[in-house]
C-alpha cells in the first residue's frame, strides 16, 4: 500500500482518512500500538514491528543514519522511512555491496557480536598478483600493525589479468590504491573474515604490500546479496 509522503499522510489524517479501532482520527500526532486496528482510505494497514531490508550500497555514500554534509545509506529509503531504521554494521565510503538495514536491535547484535563468528564475504580486485603465499598468510592471520593482528581468514584466488581496465577501479574516495595497477595487472579474489575492523580488508592487503582497488561485500552469514539489485536500490 502506497500511502504517500509524511506530508501527504498528515494531510490525509486531518481530512479524516484514517480510523483507529473504528474511530476517525484527525490528529497526526495520535499514538497507536501494535494491537490497534488501523484503516486508511478504507483499507486495513498491517503492522510490522520489525522491518528488514537488503541494500546494494554504491560507492561515495557513508554508512550512517544522518549527516549534514554527505549522502547516507538511509537517504535511499526516502522521507517515508521509519525513523528507527539503522544499518547493521558499516561499509567504507568507497566500498559497495551488501548492507542490511533494520530496526531490530536483536538482529543487529546477532550479526555483529564477535562471539557469533558470522562470516562476511567480500569480492575484491587487487593491484598486482595475489599468490598462494598470500593465501597461506591469510590462513594464519596477518599482523597488520602494533594494534591489530587479523584473525585467520579464508582467501580464494579467482584469477589474474595482466591488463587492467579503468573500470576495475572503484570510486576511490580515500583509498591508497595506485594507478600502477594499470601496469601491474589485477587479481580477482574473494575473502571471508569474521571480524569487522576499520578498513580491515584494505589494511590486510596493505600489510602484504598490495592494494585493494575495488571492494564489494557479497555475503553476511547465510544472507547473499541479490544480484538483481542495482546499486542504490533495496528490497525487503
Protein language model annotation of sequence segments:
Residues 1-236:
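Basic, flexible Lys/Arg- and Gly-enriched helix-loop patches that mediate nucleic-acid binding at interfaces
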Amino acid at each position: 500500500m502506497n500511502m504517500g509522503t509524511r506530508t501527504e499522510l498528515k494531510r490525509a489524517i486531518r481530512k479524516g482518512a484514517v480510523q483507529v479501532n473504528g474511530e476517525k482520527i484527525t490528529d497526526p500526532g495520535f499514538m497507536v500500538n501494535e494491537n490497534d486496528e488501523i484503516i486508511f482510505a478504507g483499507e486495513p494497514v498491517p503492522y510490522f514491528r520489525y522491518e528488514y531490508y537488503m541494500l546494494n550500497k554504491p560507492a561515495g555514500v557513508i554508512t550512517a543514519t544522518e549527516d549534514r554534509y554527505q549522502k547516507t545509506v538511509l537517504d535511499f529509503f526516502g522521507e517515508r522511512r521509519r525513523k528507527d531504521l539503522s544499518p547493521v554494521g558499516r561499509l567504507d565510503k568507497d566500498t559497495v555491496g551488501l548492507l542490511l538495514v533494520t530496526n531490530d536491535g536483536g538482529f543487529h547484535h546477532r550479526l555483529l557480536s564477535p562471539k557469533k563468528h558470522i562470516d562476511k564475504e567480500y569480492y575484491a580486485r587487487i593491484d598486482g598478483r595475489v599468490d598462494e603465499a598470500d593465501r597461506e598468510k591469510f590462513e594464519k592471520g596477518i599482523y597488520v600493525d602494533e594494534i591489530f593482528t587479523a584473525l585467520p581468514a579464508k582467501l580464494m584466488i579467482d584469477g589474474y589479468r595482466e591488463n587492467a581496465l579503468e573500470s576495475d577501479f572503484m570510486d576511490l574516495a580515500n583509498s591508497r590504491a595506485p594507478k600502477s595497477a594499470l601496469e601491474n595487472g589485477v587479481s580477482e579474489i574473494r575473502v571471508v573474515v569474521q571480524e569487522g575492523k576499520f578498513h580491515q580488508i584494505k589494511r590486510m592487503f596493505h600489510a602484504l604490500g598490495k592494494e585493494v582497488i575495488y571492494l564489494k561485500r557479497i555475503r553476511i552469514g547465510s544472507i547473499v546479496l541479490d544480484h538483481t539489485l542495482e546499486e542504490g536500490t533495496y528490497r525487503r
